[in-house]
Design a protein with these regions (language model features):
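Conserved AMP-binding/adenylate-forming core of the ANL superfamily
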Residues: 23-67, 71-75, 92-97
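ATP-dependent adenylate-forming carboxylate-activation enzymes
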Residues: 64, 85-98, 112-114, 224-244
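Conserved pre-ATP/AMP-binding loop-to-beta segment of ANL
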Residues: 20, 144-163, 170, 193-199
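Conserved AMP-binding A3 loop
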Residues: 32-36, 159-183
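Conserved AMP-binding/adenylation subdomain of ANL enzymes
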Residues: 182-199, 207-249, 259-260, 264
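Gly/Ser/Thr-rich phosphate-binding loop
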Residues: 192, 221, 248-253, 262-323, ...
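ANL superfamily adenylate-forming
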Residues: 113-155
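A short helix-loop-beta submotif of the ANL/AMP-binding
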Residues: 59, 65-85, 89-93, 101-107, ...
Length: 349
């Protein structure tokens, strides 16, 4: 229907219904975007990409620290049917070269801080400089023609490719469809009590599924706000969590940030009373971390998932975190899980 946003484009949906609502606060740069502003920038980026010949099925790589541009690119690609390729900025140039040769993106968008690596990769590129309106990225947005009509997509169309490493060999590209991101938003949104009033502090790398999808995309799906840390620093994170003006209600991390924060001098005096849900995943969480945060009134909600499932699979309620140490929790609402023996046969319940 004309004027109705496609189901996968919740930025456009909220821009129509709550245009003045804060969508993203890029904390260290001071940039804030309402849903209306994020929608306009996303549209301009879609137009800029289309003007460069990108369309359905084409890949666009992004090499950047945490920033709002991750979400601009994700939804701009969605409007074109293109595919986002977030790159791990911790990789060496040869490692990045392998991924780019394998995924064959038509364009590399990179932060100014990775200019040397981007030049060595010798690809068509646009540079982001969050401190300047004269960067190639911002100029491309300013000069962008109107984008084409939104691509007709289904849940099975690819939205992004995320390279993930196993124990051996080169990283392999995990195919992430629009449906996977949508169902993850639903699966996590309900038990994590995510709503339009949710405010999440995002600290995990956005090139990783944990940063993008726990809980950032579910929060944007609900019409809430995400506050992005460019890089995690425990004392600063505790300051943000304590700030009543920010009103942070949700937090997600792997165990290490929780350990770093609880070992920081500011931890005992931090005001954590506004936290509704604090999730932890990505690795087993030590009992000492669970007990310390529970004693501060913040029981950690544990989860299990993997990049290939985008990512949520199971969740263990905070009330059971200490009692059931070592458990991965129960399957999410729209998730089916089998437990099998070494022969692949279902075990008894």
């Amino acid at each position: 229907m004309p004027g109705v946003p496609p189901y996968y484009d919740w930025i456009a949906h909220h821009a129509q219904r709550r245009p003045r609502q804060l969508a993203i606060d890029d904390l260290q740069t001071g940039r804030k975007f309402t849903y209306a502003e994020l929608d306009r920038r996303t549209n301009r980026l879609a137009g800029a990409l289309a003007a460069r010949g990108l369309g359905k099925g084409d890949r666009v790589a992004l090499l950047a620290p945490n920033c709002a541009e991750y979400f601009e690119l994700q939804f701009a690609c969605g409007r074109l049917g293109a595919i986002m390729l977030p790159l791990n900025w911790r990789l060496t140039v040869p490692e990045l070269e392998y991924i780019l040769d394998d995924a064959t993106p038509k364009l590399l968008i990179h932060d100014k801080s990775f200019g040397q690596q981007a030049a060595a990769l010798a690809r068509a590129r646009l540079e982001i400089d969050v401190e300047s309106r004269e960067s190639g990225y911002e100029q491309a947005l300013s000069a962008a023609p109107p984008p084409p009509a939104p691509a007709a997509l289904t849940h099975d169309d690819i939205g992004m490719v995320m390279y993930t490493s196993g124990t051996t060999g080169h990283p392999k590209g995990a195919i992430i469809t629009h449906g996977m991101v949508f169902w993850n938003a639903v699966n996590l949104g309900i038990p994590a009590m995510i709503s339009p009033t949710t405010v999440q502090l995002v600290i995990l790398p956005l090139f990783h599924t944990g940063g993008l999808n726990c809980y950032a995309n579910p929060v944007l799906h609900a019409g809430g706000a995400i506050l992005i840390m460019r890089a995690f620093e425990p004392g600063l994170a505790l300051d943000y969590l304590s700030d009543p003006a920010l009103g942070i209600t949700h937090f997600f991390g792997v165990p290490a940030p929780y350990q770093f924060m609880m070992q920081h001098p500011k931890f005992q005096g931090a005001d954590l009373s506004r936290l509704v849900i604090s999730g932890v995943g990505g690795a087993p969480c030590a009992l000492s971390i669970l007990e310390t945060w529970t004693a501060r009134g913040v029981p950690l909600v544990q989860g299990w998932g993997m990049t290939e499932t985008s990512p949520a699979g199971t969740m263990l309620d905070g009330a059971d975190a200490v009692r059931k140490v070592g458990s991965a929790g129960r399957p999410m609402m729209h998730t089916e899980i089998r437990i099998v023996d070494e022969d692949g046969k279902d075990v008894a319940q």
